[in-house]
Amino acid sequence: MQRELTRTATGTASTWASLKQEIIEAAPGLGIDSIGFASADPFLSLKAILEEHRARGYESGFEEPDIDKRIYPELYGSQPASLIAIAVAYPSKMKDPPKSDKGKYRGILARSAWGKDYHLVLREAMEKLEAFISERVPDAILKNMVDTGELSDRAVAERAGIGFSGKNTMMISPTLGSWIYLGELLTNIPFQPDEPVTDGCGECTKCLDACPTGALVGPGQLNAQRCVSFLTQTKGFLDEEFMLKIGNRLYGCDTCQIVCPKNRGLNWDHHPELTPDPEIVKPLLLPLLDLSNREFKDRFGQSAAAWRGKKPIQRNAVIGLGNFKDVSAVPKLTEVLLDDPRPELRGTAAWALSRIGGENAMTAIKQASEKEQHEQVREMIAQAHSKLEEQEQAEQQTSAELKAEDSQGPTTIYYDEMETPVGTLTLCATDRGLCRIDYGSFYAKEALLQQWARTWVGEYVYVQEPEKLREAAEQLREYFAGERREFSIAYDLRGTPFQEQVWRALQNIPYGQSVSYQDIAESIGRAKAVRAVGGANNKNPLPILFPCHRVSGANGSLVGYAGGLPVKMKLLELEKE
């Protein structure tokens, strides 16, 4: 599919070298933070990768469907003479971010949706660059693209020396990190190409380990169908697995960038138009459900988050309210469940109500089951009903303990973070002992930790106190160093009697060995409760210490793990050594 080379602009090699230097010097004044030049040769090595990506079902559906158009640069029917890649840096930190309070919980937009829509920002910068070039080269032919164009922005940027392609699939600049927007110009000016960046990720796998859904299936390999960023932008129903992982995200996901060491300490706030409005990028969830189309456009219209309309964001707000277990949201969620014309929101509201629980939630579910006609929504209502019944039983078992704790005032939950070979761990403990180990930072797990505390602790307050977690952290470091096989730490288990029975059974699995769910079920005298054992295993609050990574499928296959399968494999390999 090689195209005829476009008519080259009039000039000499010396002319283009001088112009290139002029462009580099002018770039900051045009709103460009990094600029590079590349050949316009076809991206032939990319073709096999894209074809395999498609064959495996990893595409999002947002890409250009014609792979050849993504491989062969095209300038109005001809092959351009060269490519110019640009990068605009954006903020990673928010000044005075509002916090979620009880009854006033907030969602979050990914940083790529902070401030003015980056498509507009990039186009404005590239149009200034086009004008700059055209003024000096009247017969220049120029065409700009952002991520809605045919070419792969990252492939162009990598060839042009903007940065290297990280294991999280992001373009990582040696100076700007991955907090950058990318765009490119195709031109008939034959600029001398820049050298690619030789830096890389090395042995680091923090992004792979931290990905909430395991969407990073390998270094530089993304299954978009599992990516939280993609999932938040879809318009249909979402599986419970994904709704739990979305947390309070309304649009996008930054986890793989937050944990990246190349981004440590980097924050770019020199583009005023990209400065986030805290009330827009971290909005209260409940009011989002009442937004009209006009109100949504007025509030979010300038953000990149608006491009899919209000339905995905409202659905995600419902998910967030469910994950926060916001009791104050039950009336509004009941209204959505019973009256909203959109089945996706009705079904999601049923799920959210089952997460929150309580008599009012059960009443709403029963009312909906009598009137709902949509088949998939009816299924979600039935599932919600079953979960609420299970919750009632669990609450009866734990109510006495919770009442005793409530009478003594809020329980302090101490937390701290530690870096390990499998990524960041957040440790939590009460005065009784260690109560949780979570994969990821406290920031990333805050919604999950709050909902857990509301369910199992009652009144609570989280306080960062490294000293309270010092002994647990030290024993974990010894484990990762291969110097410890057993732990001697005081625990504070919070779960149903059956769950606690399963969790304690996990402690009996020998170091370096694996057992099946069936083995665990038999060990506690519940041979027929294999599925229930699996459910309890999935809710294990103390992975590693209660080694659920040593549990395999019936045929010895790897099964899901809270930290993701790559982490599970690492732990098993560590114990083999």
Model-derived features: positions:
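Auxiliary alpha/beta "docking" domains used to position bulky ligands
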Residues: 1-200
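Iron-sulfur cluster-binding cysteine motifs and their immediate structural context
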Residues: 32, 206-229, 248-273
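C-terminal amphipathic alpha-helical segment
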Residues: 240-274, 286-287, 291, 295-319
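Amphipathic alpha-helical scaffolding segments comprising HEAT/armadillo-like alpha-solenoid repeats
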Residues: 295-299, 326-338, 358-370
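Alpha-helix N-cap/helix-start positions at coil->helix boundaries
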Residues: 307, 311-312, 327, 341-344, ...
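Structural detector for internal amphipathic alpha-helices that build alpha-solenoid repeat scaffolds
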Residues: 314-326, 346-358, 378-390
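Basic nucleic-acid-binding alpha-helical/helix-turn surface characteristic of O6-alkylguanine DNA
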Residues: 394-527, 574-577
